[in-house]
């Protein structure tokens, strides 16, 4: 009898213990479910913020219109169903959640709405913060935690992402502008009433040896543009050393997103040993120090001039660029008056990528108008006769025409890798190996042929806005 009562008491105690344990187990299960909901929502919000920030950053080009477009792209990205509510619906981003600044680590007070940015030219970074959004995107209604406390009936979570551009597609080689004027007429009575355009002294359609120019003296002036240090300060010598500069010559980039009106650190001279790095663009990687992944060849590696049967000039140029001579050290194509015409081969190849342009005091909306090949005798007087284009000169420049192209073998090419974006400096510069220089503008030059020691031949194709050279948008935080 006593044993029976003792067994009943034990079963009762076990039932009580089981009930208590069951409550705890259910509590932990509820906690896991509710916390899992919060973690899942936070993951969705982070994906949403990352995507929206990247979409917005791609529109930031230093203009008010770019800021407006960035807001639109961020909202459009969030509205997509790819990252929100188990891919069942999009989210609505409010303006309060989208902010812009001039640096990814800017203090809270330096992040502004699109319409309140002090200087759109510097606003190259965007932050998407879902916790600032209206309505709230991170509020999660709990299923079990509310039973423990009314304060736990809803939980809030959020995510933040910062994206922007950290580079410029700018070659770390700088040269002197040949004049101080961004656009000026070239004196040539034979062309009247038409007038040829000069841009900082350079002529479109003419190839220059970029390592043999100096508008202020007989000795060549060329510089390393510091690819690592921010504009406005002279960086340490390691930043302009050959080993530091080499990968940026290969890629044609620098690691800052903007120059603006700031001065840049330049080092003279540009190292003579770095010329092979330019030739990766022609699929010549051996000995260049460049890798085929970060420095692929161009889709067209044919050098100009060449011996192909469809060569478009009636003469064979002496070199892949116009010859440089004199004091100041200029190409034979540069003197405007009272100059003895050069030999016909001295002009180098003409119009391989760009055509000479007609000057206009106001730049036409569609760009400057080109001259015709029939104008070559007036544009390029020479001895014994001016260079001439064959009747088969293509409607589009030879580089862009299939019959004048050679594709690389073994490596995948990237179009227009032969384009070099070169800072044009306000010269003369102060004496010394490391100085600060003002950038007048950025010239676009097309490599006509592989470089060699002391020779970097590139045809001028006009000026390019800095905002058009910003690197790819990157997720930074």
Which residues fall in each region the model found?
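N-linked glycosylation sequons
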Residues: 109-122, 127, 137-477
């Amino acid at each position: 009898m006593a044993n029976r009562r003792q067994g009943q008491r034990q079963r009762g105690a076990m039932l009580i213990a089981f009930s208590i344990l069951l409550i705890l187990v259910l509590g932990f299960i509820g906690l896991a479910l509710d916390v899992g909901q919060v973690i899942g929502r936070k993951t969705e919000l982070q994906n949403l913020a990352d995507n929206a920030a990247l979409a917005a950053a791609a529109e930031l080009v230093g203009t008010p219109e770019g800021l407006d477009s960035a807001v639109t792209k961020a909202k459009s990205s969030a509205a997509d169903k790819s990252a929100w509510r188990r891919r069942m619906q999009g989210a609505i981003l409010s303006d309060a959640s989208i902010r812009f600044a001039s640096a990814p680590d800017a203090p809270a007070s330096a992040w502004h709405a699109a319409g309140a940015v002090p200087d759109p030219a510097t606003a190259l970074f965007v932050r998407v913060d879902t916790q600032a959004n209206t309505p709230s995107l991170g509020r999660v209604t709990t299923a079990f935690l509310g039973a423990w406390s009314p304060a736990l009936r809803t939980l809030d979570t959020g995510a933040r992402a910062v994206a922007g551009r950290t580079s410029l597609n700018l070659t770390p080689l700088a040269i002197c502008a040949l004049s101080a004027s961004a656009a000026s007429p070239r004196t040539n009575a034979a062309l009247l009433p038409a007038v040829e355009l000069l841009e900082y002294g350079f002529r479109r359609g003419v190839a220059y040896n970029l390592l043999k120019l100096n508008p202020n003296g007989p000795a060549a002036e060329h510089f390393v543009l510091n690819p690592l240090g921010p504009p406005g300060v002279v960086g340490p010598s390691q930043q302009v050393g050959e080993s530091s500069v080499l990968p940026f010559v290969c890629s044609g980039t620098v690691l800052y997103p903007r120059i603006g009106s700031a001065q840049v650190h330049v080092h003279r001279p540009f190292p003579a040993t770095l010329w092979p790095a330019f030739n990766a663009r022609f699929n010549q990687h051996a000995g260049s120090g460049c890798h085929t992944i970060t420095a692929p060849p161009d889709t067209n590696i044919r050098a100009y001039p060449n011996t192909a049967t469809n060569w478009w000039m009636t003469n064979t140029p002496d070199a892949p660029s116009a010859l440089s001579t004199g004091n100041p050290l200029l190409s034979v194509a540069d003197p405007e008056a009272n100059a003895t015409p050069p030999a016909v081969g001295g002009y180098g190849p003409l119009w391989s990528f760009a055509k000479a342009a007609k000057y206009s005091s106001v730049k036409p909306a569609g760009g400057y108008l080109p001259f015709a090949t029939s104008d070559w005798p007036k544009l390029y007087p020479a001895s014994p006769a001016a260079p001439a284009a064959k009747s088969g000169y293509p409607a589009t420049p030879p580089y862009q025409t299939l019959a004048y192209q050679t594709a690389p073998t073994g490596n995948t090419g990237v179009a227009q890798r032969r384009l070099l974006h070169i800072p044009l400096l306000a010269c003369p510069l102060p004496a010394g190996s490391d100085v600060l220089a003002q950038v007048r503008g950025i010239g676009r030059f097309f490599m006509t042929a592989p470089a060699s020691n002391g020779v970097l031949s590139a045809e001028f194709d006009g000026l390019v806005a800095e905002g058009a050279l910003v690197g790819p948008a990157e997720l930074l935080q």
